[in-house]
Amino acid sequence: MKLLLAEDQSMLRDALSQLLQLQPDVEVVYQAEDGREAMELLKTNLVDVAILDVEMPYQTGLDVLEWIKEHQPVVKVIIVTTFKRPGYFERAVKADVDAYVLKERSIADLMKTIHTVLAGQKEYSPELMEVMMTHKNPLSHQE
Protein backbone atom coordinates (compact mmCIF):
# COMPACT_ATOMS: atom_id res chain seq x y z
CA MET A 1 0.00 0.00 0.00
CA LYS A 2 1.01 3.59 -0.54
CA LEU A 3 0.81 6.02 2.38
CA LEU A 4 1.12 9.75 2.87
CA LEU A 5 2.38 10.89 6.28
CA ALA A 6 1.89 14.58 7.08
CA GLU A 7 3.49 15.63 10.37
CA ASP A 8 5.25 18.91 11.11
CA GLN A 9 7.59 17.50 13.80
CA SER A 10 10.49 16.17 11.72
CA MET A 11 11.85 13.66 14.24
CA LEU A 12 8.42 12.10 14.77
CA ARG A 13 7.69 12.12 11.02
CA ASP A 14 11.01 10.45 10.17
CA ALA A 15 10.70 7.81 12.90
CA LEU A 16 7.10 6.98 12.06
CA SER A 17 7.90 6.81 8.35
CA GLN A 18 10.80 4.41 8.96
CA LEU A 19 8.67 2.17 11.16
CA LEU A 20 5.85 2.13 8.60
CA GLN A 21 8.28 1.27 5.79
CA LEU A 22 9.37 -1.82 7.74
CA GLN A 23 5.85 -3.23 7.47
CA PRO A 24 5.63 -5.91 4.75
CA ASP A 25 2.50 -4.52 3.08
CA VAL A 26 3.72 -0.90 2.91
CA GLU A 27 5.15 -0.08 -0.52
CA VAL A 28 6.00 3.59 -0.02
CA VAL A 29 5.54 6.37 2.55
CA TYR A 30 5.45 9.89 1.13
CA GLN A 31 6.34 12.53 3.74
CA ALA A 32 4.98 16.06 4.10
CA GLU A 33 6.04 18.56 6.75
CA ASP A 34 2.89 20.68 6.46
CA GLY A 35 -0.61 20.64 5.03
CA ARG A 36 0.30 22.54 1.88
CA GLU A 37 3.06 20.05 1.01
CA ALA A 38 0.64 17.18 1.71
CA MET A 39 -1.84 18.53 -0.84
CA GLU A 40 0.92 19.04 -3.42
CA LEU A 41 2.11 15.44 -2.94
CA LEU A 42 -1.45 14.18 -3.31
CA LYS A 43 -1.81 16.00 -6.64
CA THR A 44 1.08 14.01 -8.13
CA ASN A 45 1.07 10.69 -6.22
CA LEU A 46 -1.67 8.12 -5.78
CA VAL A 47 -1.98 6.96 -2.19
CA ASP A 48 -4.27 4.53 -0.42
CA VAL A 49 -4.20 6.19 3.00
CA ALA A 50 -3.27 9.67 4.23
CA ILE A 51 -2.12 9.87 7.85
CA LEU A 52 -2.44 13.46 9.01
CA ASP A 53 -1.48 15.44 12.10
CA VAL A 54 -4.12 18.02 13.06
CA GLU A 55 -2.03 21.10 13.76
CA MET A 56 0.45 21.86 10.98
CA PRO A 57 1.66 25.06 9.32
CA TYR A 58 -0.06 26.57 6.27
CA GLN A 59 -2.92 24.05 6.09
CA THR A 60 -4.11 21.97 9.03
CA GLY A 61 -4.74 18.26 8.87
CA LEU A 62 -8.45 19.09 8.92
CA ASP A 63 -8.02 21.34 5.87
CA VAL A 64 -6.19 18.53 4.07
CA LEU A 65 -8.91 16.05 5.09
CA GLU A 66 -11.60 18.28 3.57
CA TRP A 67 -9.53 18.75 0.40
CA ILE A 68 -9.02 14.99 0.04
CA LYS A 69 -12.71 14.20 0.50
CA GLU A 70 -13.57 16.75 -2.20
CA HIS A 71 -10.83 15.96 -4.73
CA GLN A 72 -9.75 12.35 -4.03
CA PRO A 73 -12.59 10.66 -2.14
CA VAL A 74 -11.14 7.15 -2.63
CA VAL A 75 -8.19 8.04 -0.37
CA LYS A 76 -8.77 6.94 3.21
CA VAL A 77 -7.84 9.50 5.87
CA ILE A 78 -6.55 8.86 9.38
CA ILE A 79 -6.11 11.81 11.73
CA VAL A 80 -3.43 11.05 14.33
CA THR A 81 -3.26 13.63 17.09
CA THR A 82 -2.42 14.41 20.70
CA PHE A 83 -5.40 16.74 20.94
CA LYS A 84 -8.65 15.64 22.55
CA ARG A 85 -10.47 18.82 21.56
CA PRO A 86 -14.11 18.13 20.70
CA GLY A 87 -14.15 20.84 18.02
CA TYR A 88 -11.39 19.13 16.03
CA PHE A 89 -13.08 15.75 16.33
CA GLU A 90 -16.49 17.13 15.33
CA ARG A 91 -15.05 18.86 12.26
CA ALA A 92 -13.22 15.68 11.23
CA VAL A 93 -16.33 13.52 11.59
CA LYS A 94 -18.39 16.07 9.66
CA ALA A 95 -15.78 15.84 6.86
CA ASP A 96 -16.15 12.02 6.86
CA VAL A 97 -12.77 11.13 8.37
CA ASP A 98 -12.10 7.40 8.25
CA ALA A 99 -10.24 7.23 11.57
CA TYR A 100 -9.39 9.70 14.33
CA VAL A 101 -6.91 8.30 16.80
CA LEU A 102 -4.45 9.48 19.42
CA LYS A 103 -0.68 9.39 18.90
CA GLU A 104 -0.14 7.25 22.00
CA ARG A 105 -0.38 4.03 20.02
CA SER A 106 2.00 1.43 18.69
CA ILE A 107 2.88 0.88 15.03
CA ALA A 108 0.99 -2.43 15.26
CA ASP A 109 -2.12 -0.53 16.39
CA LEU A 110 -1.67 2.05 13.63
CA MET A 111 -1.36 -0.75 11.05
CA LYS A 112 -4.60 -2.28 12.39
CA THR A 113 -6.25 1.12 11.93
CA ILE A 114 -4.91 1.36 8.38
CA HIS A 115 -6.34 -2.06 7.54
CA THR A 116 -9.63 -1.16 9.23
CA VAL A 117 -10.13 1.93 7.07
CA LEU A 118 -9.03 0.11 3.92
CA ALA A 119 -11.78 -2.42 4.69
CA GLY A 120 -14.29 0.44 4.65
CA GLN A 121 -14.79 0.74 8.40
CA LYS A 122 -14.43 3.75 10.68
CA GLU A 123 -12.35 3.92 13.84
CA TYR A 124 -12.35 6.52 16.59
CA SER A 125 -10.21 6.35 19.75
CA PRO A 126 -12.33 5.46 22.79
CA GLU A 127 -10.72 8.35 24.70
CA LEU A 128 -12.03 10.77 22.08
CA MET A 129 -15.49 9.27 22.22
CA GLU A 130 -15.47 9.71 26.00
CA VAL A 131 -14.52 13.38 25.63
CA MET A 132 -17.35 13.83 23.13
CA MET A 133 -19.90 12.17 25.41
CA THR A 134 -18.91 14.29 28.42
CA HIS A 135 -18.38 17.56 26.50
CA LYS A 136 -20.95 20.09 27.52
CA ASN A 137 -21.97 22.64 24.93
CA PRO A 138 -24.42 24.86 26.80
CA LEU A 139 -26.68 27.15 24.86
CA SER A 140 -26.01 30.84 25.08
CA HIS A 141 -28.54 33.14 26.71
CA GLN A 142 -29.82 34.11 23.26
CA GLU A 143 -30.55 30.50 22.35
PLM feature spans:
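Conserved acidic carboxylate
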Residues: 7
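Acidic, metal-coordinating helix/loop segments flanking the phosphotransfer/catalytic sites
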Residues: 31-49
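Acidic catalytic/metal-coordinating carboxylates
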Residues: 34, 60-63
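Two-component signal transduction core modules
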Residues: 50, 77, 100-101
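Active-site residues of response regulator receiver
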Residues: 53, 81
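The feature encodes the CheY-like receiver
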Residues: 57
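Short amphipathic alpha-helix used as the core "switch/output" element in two-component signaling
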Residues: 62-73, 94
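Short, flexible helix-to-coil linker/hinge segments that flank and couple to helix-turn-helix
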Residues: 87-93, 98, 102-143
